[in-house]
UniProtKB/Swiss-Prot annotation:
Involved in transcription antitermination. Required for transcription of ribosomal RNA (rRNA) genes. Binds specifically to the boxA antiterminator sequence of the ribosomal RNA (rrn) operons. One of its GO terms (molecular function) is RNA binding. Belongs to the NusB family. Disulfide bonds: none annotated. It comes from the Bacteria. It holds the Pfam family NusB. It comes from Coxiella burnetii (strain CbuK_Q154). This is Transcription antitermination protein NusB. PANTHER family: ANTITERMINATION NUSB DOMAIN-CONTAINING PROTEIN, N UTILIZATION SUBSTANCE PROTEIN B-RELATED. The gene is nusB.
Amino acid sequence: MINKTRHNARRYALQALYQWFFCETKPDALISQFMEEHDLSDTEVAYFKEVVTGTIQHVAIIDELMTAHLDRKISALNPVELSVLRLSIYELLHRKEVPYKVVIDEALELVKEFGAEAGHKYVNAILDVLSSEIRKGV
């Protein structure tokens, strides 16, 4: 069963990170703008803020972890899939209370909704390997 408010937080976080991909706005400004433009009443707002800020703050480490498992340069990734991967890797690293299967399932739902037709297969393959590496022993 999906936690709807947490799912919405991830959904909006993906949209914010996608926007950040193109304009690299500072996290606080991006979050403020996003909250002004969207109704987040059905969303876990604190989680939204944390994952957006945290993903942006740790993007270099996240990208480094991801790059080892890509079959192409990071710049060649679809921006939606890249944003989903970054968000999910942040959760795997910093939200250990969230089961890795939930992180992957949520990522796949987001890619199916916003990404390319077969993008979920690519994202699943990368997150499957990374979740084992990041969460080993957890």
